Amino acid sequence: MEARELGSPTPTYHLLPKANQHTVKEDASSPSQGSPETMQLKKEISLLNGVSLVVGNMIGSGIFVSPKGVLKYTASYGLSLVVWAIGGLFSVVGALCYAELGTTITKSGASYAYILEAFGGFIAFIRLWVSLLIVEPTSQAIIAITFANYIIKPSFPTCDPPYVACRLLAAACVCLLTFVNCAYVKWGTRVQDTFTYAKVLALIAIIIMGLVKLCQGHTEHFQDAFKGSSWNVGDLSLALYSALFSYSGWDTLNFVTEEIKNPERNLPLAIGISMPIVTLIYILTNVAYYTVLNIQDVHKSDAVAVTFADQTFGMFSWTIPIAVALSCFGGLNASIFASSRLFFVGSREGHLPNLLSMIHIERFTPVPALLFNCTMTLIYLVVKDVFLLINYFSFSYWFFVGLSVVGQLYLRWKEPDWPRPLKLSLFFPIVFCICSLFLVAVPLFSDTINSLIGIGIALSGVPVYFMGVYLPEARRPLFIRKVLATVTRVTQKLCFCVLTELDVAEEKNVERKTD
């Protein structure tokens, strides 16, 4: 709702004189405290929007492009389908644990917020630092480049698309989606809904074609489905890693908990609806691929869905590359939507500059956080070998996800009286913690160098925490304080935004952690 539509006078907000100020001054003409128009993110995400966010972020380009990663390490159709099922089951358990955490700690920010409540600011800051520096911008840059490649590739069938053209189109995609999410939250959710429907329909088309082929008697690839299976523990671990990469994104809704309507009901319900849908679609899509393609075809393919379409869709085979591009577009939108809220919450907790916790005074969108996220992604689009950076955060990703669930167990013991609308059996978080420990250990042994680089990136946040969070503001470098104050004032003027107000209703159940 825009401010001019309200019956009460429009508040006039004064610019902050200093970057460290935590309140927003209003004129006497501003609404009273009883006014419903408070300066905070609005609850605009419905159950359907939540399902679209989770499904849309989980179903990216992975299921279209990289099923061969699982098949490569399992060496048989039967075992690969088992690994896909295990990956889905593991993701369901993790999502259920996050559903309990999200309904207990009703803050946005996902694992950052949960680690903050359980273990304090330092570890939470390191989690935020890794996401800010490598995880979010790298992931979004890769998705945007994949989108651009699939859009441009049909114009260059005999060679690779021009490097500059791909990067420029990727940058345009990131900027467009950032604008959409800056404009209105509803615009972002509508884009998400639309592109989620499109990618699901594309996968249903693949599944139907595969089932038709099965009904026509093409069952030869399943007659001895486990023949040649690799039972090596290392290979199975890498196969599971490949499957879990495609399942990543099940925690998307936990990044935006504060914007969900009735989160105690809709958060676990959206997760409960989304996870079986994605797991079933993934398994059936792989069955369709394996019905038509032999193992050699899958190994040689750069995009399994495109190879499948070339052999089955005939003159309509061009639709699948478009579907992959649309899938990337929707996945990028969900990632931008979620990661901007992570930076927003980090700023609100004092771990990032205050300007990132500002929202537009009429549109109620976190414009500075969205622009910061966009800037970081554009910087990584300039890096030529950006795809190599993804190897650095597998270790840290599973470490912090697992640590969040360890925090769930810790809070069960430390705060047994906290209201928990959803309370799981301890079996689920314990199993997830054990599996997460395994997933942390695998890259340490199989990809030691990249894992150590990832640890180094995380540890680089220690001096930043000391200088920017731990030290009292008066002892921080004067130059940095002046720069932040200037940038904050300019941001307010350009983006027409102010600091948010704390939601007392959200804060009353969970005491805010401070160091």
UniProtKB/Swiss-Prot annotation:
It catalyses: L-lysine(out) + L-arginine(in) = L-lysine(in) + L-arginine(out); L-leucine(out) + L-arginine(in) + Na(+)(out) = L-leucine(in) + L-arginine(out) + Na(+)(in); L-glutamine(out) + L-arginine(in) + Na(+)(out) = L-glutamine(in) + L-arginine(out) + Na(+)(in); L-histidine(out) + L-arginine(in) + Na(+)(out) = L-histidine(in) + L-arginine(out) + Na(+)(in). Its main location: membrane. The keyword Repeat does not apply. Induction: Up-regulated by ammonia. It is a multi-pass membrane protein. The chain crosses the membrane at residues 45-65, 79-99, 115-135, 168-188, 195-215, 236-256, 267-287, 312-332, 364-384, 386-406, 425-445, 452-472. The keyword Transmembrane helix applies. Disulfide-linked heterodimer with the amino acid transport protein SLC3A2/4F2hc. Belongs to the amino acid-polyamine-organocation (APC) superfamily. L-type amino acid transporter (LAT) (TC 2.A.3.8) family. Heterodimer with SLC3A2, that functions as an antiporter which operates as an efflux routeby exporting cationic amino acids such as L-arginine from inside the cells in exchange with neutral amino acids like L-leucine, L-glutamine and isoleucine, plus sodium ions and may participate in nitric oxide synthesis. Also exchanges L-arginine with L-lysine in a sodium-independent manner. The transport mechanism is electroneutral and operates with a stoichiometry of 1: 1. This is Y+L amino acid transporter 2.
